[in-house]
UniProtKB/Swiss-Prot annotation:
Catalytic activity, EC: 6.1.1.5
Subcellular location, principal: cytoplasm
The name this protein goes by in its record: Isoleucine--tRNA ligase
Entry GO MF terms: aminoacyl-tRNA deacylase activity; ATP binding; isoleucine-tRNA ligase activity; tRNA binding; zinc ion binding
Lineage of origin: Bacteria, Pseudomonadati, Campylobacterota, Epsilonproteobacteria, Campylobacterales
Function: Catalyzes the attachment of isoleucine to tRNA(Ile). As IleRS can inadvertently accommodate and process structurally similar amino acids such as valine, to avoid such errors it has two additional distinct tRNA(Ile)-dependent editing activities. One activity is designated as 'pretransfer' editing and involves the hydrolysis of activated Val-AMP. The other activity is designated 'posttransfer' editing and involves deacylation of mischarged Val-tRNA(Ile).
Keywords: Aminoacyl-tRNA synthetase, ATP-binding, Cytoplasm, Ligase, Metal-binding, Nucleotide-binding, Protein biosynthesis, Zinc
InterPro entries: aa-tRNA-synth_I_CS (IPR001412), aa-tRNA-synth_Ia (IPR002300), Anticodon_Ile_BEm (IPR033708), Ile-tRNA-ligase (IPR002301), Ile-tRNA-ligase_type1 (IPR023585), Ile-tRNA_ligase (IPR050081), M/V/L/I-tRNA-synth_anticd-bd (IPR013155), Rossmann-like_a/b/a_fold (IPR014729)
Entry binding sites for ATP: K613
Sequence motif: 'KMSKS' region, positions: 610-614
UniProt cross-references to CDD domains, sorted A to Z: Anticodon_Ia_Ile_BEm, IleRS_core
Domain notes: IleRS has two distinct active sites: one for aminoacylation and one for editing. The misactivated valine is translocated from the active site to the editing site, which sterically excludes the correctly activated isoleucine. The single editing site contains two valyl binding pockets, one specific for each substrate (Val-AMP or Val-tRNA(Ile)).
Amino acids binding Zn(2+): C890, C893, C905, C908
Length: 917
């Protein structure tokens, strides 16, 4: 007889091989047809008591998505779904940053020389087309990753109503008195020909000169000091700025010496000056810094006067203690000179070349002007050193960290230009400054990780006023009018509202297309002929920083609460979007636009190196999806400590694939063995079932808590350990005998099936937010007792607690099992046995039912017969004897419980009788 036909073997249509790369797109297509998945999530939670709004930080609509984009969006969507399955109403409106330099540069490359013949309107139209193209491309790429969001109604910062909303936000800040225009040194990208905000600057190593230059004091200064001659020795790393020198700064709290050679240094730095060979160190006089105040020295390049001033910014950690001061080329220089009413000189044009200011202000001798005007400043350094002659006391080169433009990757300069600023230190917010209010709001914000509050807090504490103007074409205009005669900017509610309404209807392009008379009301008190336009555009960080107002507060989008529950981006956004949003939100609402901030690290290769095409270590999301499947990409993120940098490689993805297979195969086994279960009624669970349900209760609860705290790696670690060690490693293995060999309705079998069904149901609930595709697929093959009324994954819920804790203390049994298998390993190694079914176990206690103990140790039976002892061990003073089973192997269940090898054991005989009946 073929006894295999009599066994209740597992059966399921849920495939062992996931075939993710081929099958995922089909399921994703269903999710996105008519926005099915997102709309269903909204509908299912329309009466929810709680809500969760994640406001999407907009990526640039430029280029294809990379693995960092995938990390960011998948993490966002997972958190959204975590709250959804908690029973909360959720909103996730994706967006794109459509303005700015990255897009404009790409368009410039496409247009080439043609750009010079185009109007601003035409250039902006090309930019708009470029952004639109990549919005569509990126949207499809995100959807190919199965990311669920309101893709049919995204926000785009270039939409007409959005540009109007950005402009209205700017006007609100102006009305608060926090906006001003002034000439001030700002980071300037000569390569991009535009001002930059702090967030648009990155630091790289750069080689520069370190020079010490003598500026001779004039006769009056020497007389006042009582010396025949003296020279201040200034230190600088930017020789090209010496032509614009207006002052020399000393620290007012330090003493300065005049050496025997007539050189002036800070007393605290004299020793280092001796070491450099600049002086013998013999002191002629020592004076307090303030005795030098307002004396004048002579610039050796042009003979112009340079005033000695006091500056708290002068440090004693290097240099000479006397700082070359060019107020047009440094923020500290600017503020120090401002106190003395010293003129700001700016002899450098927007492309980084010396201009006619050299001639107009006499900054170089006339015979040198032809050589220097039009010369790029970085090419002028060597020429400047040569011109200094004997006044150049010391010159060397060194490597230091220097600011670079984040887009052109060229070094930037400080350049004084007229720009628009949001003021950090004006007490305009109920007597408080924007800086003070922003810091207060940070203390009310939850950070993941908590260290984030210190990081952004120190940045807010030390940041300068925010330069929000740019001298480019593609952006939202700072659409203000000036009086033609007085050049005063006009802040007027009537004009603000009228321009905003035009932008809403025609877009911000109208600022360039329309004449002034068409941009003001017909009955306006202002005469169009007396007005002129401001043509600067807004920093894109202002665009993105005001998205909360346009998306959450405008009513234009079904995007959730007016204050976002969470902002989630890479850790670099402490100085970027998190901060710009904080400043805009606090400025207009005196409140941060978010309740919490979560940051993630960056993606690197297996060795922790940054990915680049030149290194050949780039792994694109599309490659992962087509090679391994999106589910593997998701699991890679969720198994990683995303707060730190995440390493990715084929090797790592293969390891993640192994973990996925463990999860999938466990689900498959559970489904296959509950396929014929008719109900969940059981008189009493067996001890082993109580044990696994108790273990599952603890693990599921801990994993759920970890997921709810966004600690996905911790949650999965607990879960995978349970699936491998407890569920698959012990329980499923020891349950096979009763599942396969007991009668269909046997109490022991049903107890196991019900336990497995309960575990399967909760496991699918728990994985729904993380591995939605796999859970959705599993539900199609699950017993109705597991899936209930769920038509798909979006009908599942984590609102019910899994509570089957029977208070089982398994310490004794786990210790006994461990020691038992230590002995089994020895017996197998010595080739005494091949299987534990060849054994019986002899015990002297009756704490547990013998039948269940036999299953626990996977032996044929618990026996007190006098049999051959193969091994012994002891646990808590209880003795265990491993004996050689004396009966024959049952041809059906393979346990050694039969009288002869042809006859089934008593249990199997009973089952067979039932089948024959």
């Amino acid at each position: 007889m073929d006894y295999k036909e009599t066994l209740l073997l597992p059966s399921t249509s849920f495939a062992m091989r996931a075939n993710l790369a081929e099958l995922e797109p089909q399921r994703f297509k269903k999710w996105f047809e008519q926005n099915y998945a997102y709309e269903k999530m909204k509908e299912n939670r329309k009466n929810a008591k709680k809500s969760f709004t994640l406001h999407d930080g907009p990526p640039y609509a430029n280029g294809h998505i990379h693995i960092g984009h995938a990390l960011n969006k998948i993490l966002k969507e997972t958190i959204i779904k975590t709250h959804y399955f908690k029973g909360e109403s959720v909103r996730f409106t994706p967006g794109w940053d459509c303005h700015g330099l990255p897009i404009e540069q790409q368009v410039e490359v496409k247009l080439g020389e043609k750009k010079k013949s185009l109007s601003k309107k035409e250039i902006r139209e090309f930019c708009r087309q470029h952004a639109s193209e990549f919005v569509d491309i990126q949207r499809e790429e995100f959807k190919n990753l199965g990311i669920i969001a309101d893709w049919d109604k995204p926000y785009l910062t270039m939409k007409f109503e959005f540009e109007a909303a950005i402009y209205r936000t700017l006007c609100e800040i102006a009305k608060k008195g926090l906006l001003c225009e002034r000439s001030k040194p700002v980071f300037w990208s000569w390569a991009a020909k535009s001002a930059l905000a702090e967030a648009e600057v990155e630091y790289q190593d750069k080689e520069d000169y370190s020079i010490f230059v003598a500026f001779d004091l004039d006769v009056k200064a020497c007389e006042k000091l009582g010396v025949s001659k003296a020279s201040t020795v200034i230190w600088t790393t930017t020789p090209w700025t010496l032509v614009a020198n207006q002052a020399i700064a000393l620290n007012p709290n330090e003493n300065y010496v005049i050496t025997k050679e007539g050189l002036i240094f800070a007393s605290a730095l004299l020793k280092s000056m001796v070491e450099k060979g600049l002086t013998s160190g013999e002191i002629q006089k020592e004076l307090n810094a303030k005795e030098f105040e307002k004396l004048e020295a002579i610039n050796p390049l042009n003979g112009r006067k340079s005033v000695l001033i006091m500056g708290e910014h002068v440090l004693m950690d290097g240099g000479s203690g006397l700082v070359h001061t060019a107020p047009g080329h440094g923020e500290d220089d600017y503020y120090a000179c401002l106190k003395y009413g010293i003129e700001v000189l700016m002899p450098v044009d927007d492309s980084g070349c010396y201009d006619e200011t050299l001639r107009a202000k006499g900054l170089l001798p006339s015979h040198l002007l032809e050589e220097f005007i039009g010369l790029h400043i970085f090419k002028a350094n060597e020429k400047i050193l040569e011109l200094l002659g004997e006044k150049l006391l010391h010159s060397s080169k060194f490597i230091h960290s220097y600011p670079f433009c984040w887009r052109t990757h060229k070094p930037v300069i400080y350049r004084a230009t007229k720009q628009w600023f949001i003021l950090m230190d004006e007490p305009k917010l109920q007597g408080k400054t924007l800086r003070e209010c922003a810091k207060e709001q940070l203390l009310k914000t939850t950070f993941y990780p908590q260290s984030g509050v210190k990081r952004i807090g120190s940045m807010v504490e030390n940041r300068p006023d925010w330069c929000i103007s740019r001298q480019r074409d593609w952006g939202t205009p700072i659409a203000f009018f000036r009086d033609k005669n007085t050049k005063e900017v006009i802040f007027d509610d009537e004009l603000f509202d009228f321009v905003a309404a035009i932008f809403e209807k025609h877009g911000a392009d109208a600022w360039w297309e329309f004449e002034i008379k068409d941009l003001i009301p017909t009955n306006s008190k202002y005469n169009a002929e007396n007005l002129e336009k401001v043509y600067d555009i807004l920093d894109v960080w202002f665009d993105s920083g005001s998205t909360f107002n346009a998306v959450l507060n405008s009513g234009l989008y079904d995007a959730g609460e007016k204050r976002a529950s969470m902002y989630l981006e890479g850790s670099d956004q402490h100085r970027g979007w998190f901060q710009s949003s904080l400043l805009v939100g606090t400025a207009i609402n005196e409140s941060a636009p978010y309740e919490s901030i979560l940051t993630h690290g960056f993606t690197t290769d297996e060795k922790g190196q940054k990915m680049s095409k030149s290194k050949g270590n780039v792994i694109a999301p599309e490659y992962v999806a087509k090679t391994y499947g999106v589910e593997i990409l998701r699991l890679w993120i969720l198994l990683s400590d995303y707060l730190s940098d995440l390493k990715i490689s084929d090797n790592i993805l293969k390891q993640v694939g192994e973990q996925y297979r463990k999860i999938r195969n466990t689900i498959r086994f559970l489904l296959a063995n509950t396929n014929d279960l008719k109900d969940l009624e059981v008189k009493e669970f067996s001890f082993i079932d109580k044990w696994i349900l108790s273990r599952a209760t603890k693990v599921f609860k801990a994993s759920k808590e970890a997921f709810f705290a966004y600690e996905f790696a911790k949650g999965f670690s607990l879960l995978l350990n349970f699936l491998s060690a407890d569920l698959s490693g012990i329980y499923l293995d020891i349950s096979k005998d009763r599942l396969y060999c007991d009668s269909e309705n046997a109490q022991r079998r049903k107890s196991a099936q019900v336990a497995m069904a309960l575990i399967a149901k909760e496991l699918l609930n728990l994985l729904a937010s993380n591995l939605s595709y796999s859970v959705d697929e599993a539900l199609e093959h699950a017993n109705v007792l597991i899936k209930g009324d769920a038509k798909d994954v979006f009908d599942l819920s984590l609102t019910q607690d899994f509570d089957y804790d029977f208070g089982i203390d398994d310490t004794f049994l786990m210790s006994a099992r461990e020691k038992f298998f230590e002995q089994i390993d020895i017996l197998k190694k010595d080739k005494i046995i091949k299987s534990t079914l060849e054994l019986n176990l002899n015990i002297s206690f009756n704490k547990f039912p013998n039948e269940e103990l036999a299953d626990w140790f996977m032996v044929s039976q618990i026996s007190n017969e006098n049999e051959e002892i193969l091994a012994e061990f002891e646990v808590e003073n209880e003795k265990f004897k491993i004996t050689k089973a004396s009966l024959c192997k049952c041809p059906r269940c393979w346990k050694l419980q039969s009288k002869d090898e042809e006859t089934p054991c008593l249990r199997c005989e009973e089952v067979l009788k039932g089948i024959q009946c």
